[in-house]
Amino acid sequence: MKKLLCVLVICFVMTAVKTQPVTINKQLKDFQDTFDLSTPLNAGITCSYLIVNGKENLWRNASAYMIREYLPKSKAPDRTVNETKKTRMLNGTIKEVIVYKDSIACMITQIDSAYYSIRILVFEDGKWLNIGEDMGRGLENSREVFYAKAPNTLREHHRSIEVKSVSTDTLAFVSYVKQYGVEPKDFLLEALTTHPLVIYGELHRRKVSWDFLTSTLYDPRFTEKVGTVFVELPSYQQSEFDRFYASKELDTEILLEIMRSEQIYGWWDRGEYEFLINVWKLNQTLPSDKQIKIVSVDEQLPYKLLKTAEDFKQSEASLPDRNTNMANVVEKTLKIKIDKRNSLLIVGYGHAYKSHVPGGSSAAQGQEPALTAGAQLVQRLSDNNVFVVLQHVPMGTNSGALGFIRQGLFDAVFEKTGNKPVAFHLGGSPFGAEPYDVDYTMSFDSRAGNFADNFDGYIFLNPLKDEDPDYILYDIWSDPFIDEMKRRAAITNDNMNRWFSIEGELTKEKIITIFKEEYKGKKRWSQLFE
């Protein structure tokens, strides 16, 4: 009897979860072309007609918050759609609609014998909104694809509702900044005094950030408390770093070659380059026991050692996770170093956060990404020994800025307090209690938590509207390095012209001209204020 009851319960649960599909079996052209988001079917039809008509400017209105920022803005021009594609779409047969737990739905359309479109929709703000398209191989496979992903889609949807909700009352935030905010340099130096390791989560090629770090470097308190600085450059180049800092004459070519070895096209962060030179200059004025040790932590392919396509494939397949390599190098260095002073790790904020969302852009193809270096180091060294700082940045992805953190709430607070540089603890603050949304994609993962789950401190340096353009190290592009990039492209089957949007022969002059023209007279985040 108990077994029978269990079977009945399981069957009931499965039936409740897997709602019976609603059969449609009509071609798209059988339905009117209207903008209607009232039901999953109508919303799916609306999305299909947006594709047929190339209406790029309407996708944001038809899509949910969790993908909206990726989509063209309202002034986007129509896309030209060829007649073959239009006919194919219009003749597609809408097979069925499935609703999952009243919040997730899909419309399955047979485009041709081999391609089934699965339009995914969520119920948000009283409307059924698009969150993307999946593909199936036949009707049954399309159902399986939808049901397999539906539970996670539902979790992301619930999280997106939380992330989307933002307070319009700034009083508590403004009061906290006024009561507890301190000067950023004092804040960072205090953290470096009280913690064996401070992780500074930065945004690359940001002059204001490197100027701040350089100012902190030259403060006498820094060399009293800090002996090691870890940087996000290739760890296999440590011997070259040691050679650079051991030299009695400033040899910038050593440093430039290190920068050229980071990624296939080099690393053109001028602020980091100048900071590393300033460490060399400072060390010349210090006794040996007070000098700063630079340790590189990133895992990158040793391109100069790779001579063939097969070398590249083997090296890439065996590449350790970047975050794990960073954590390994830091942990090992802290264990063996004789210098009792504390340490600073300067790394992109995407490698710094503490929550247990796996890191991005870190694992070799086919491998599961590990936790970030920040999360791993907290696990290994304890939360008390690691202090993680985030600087104020736009909301975005690894590909660029998309909007504002908490939809501009933090920016509004800093404006109300005079846009003066300030830093504060996130724990116990209204800022720390806000859902973490710095990384747009990651923010919809329920494991992301809030700001205090990811960082301990927050630093505001300047308003985003005043941000200088990317601080570019033009010096890395020499004629020999252009030849080396071409060689790297050949063994990796890549296209350098595509990377830099260059027609014809790739030259250093063309690369430099493209960057200078792109940034001339512009602020870095100008598109956010249009």
Please name every model-derived segment.
Residues 4-13:
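Sec-dependent N-terminal signal peptides
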Residues 12-23:
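Bacterial Sec-dependent signal peptides at the C-terminal "C-region" and cleavage site
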Residues 22-38, 66-122, 133-136:
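Surface-exposed, charged secondary-structure patches
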Residues 27-55:
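Short, aromatic-enriched amphipathic alpha-helices that serve as compact interaction elements
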Residues 46-71:
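Short, well-ordered alpha-helical segments enriched in acidic and aromatic residues
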Residues 63-66, 101-103, 110-113, 122-125, ...:
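A mature extracytoplasmic/lumenal domain signature
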Residues 129-149:
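A short, surface-exposed interaction/processing loop segment used at functional sites
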Residues 147-530:
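Compositional signal for N-terminal targeting/processing segments
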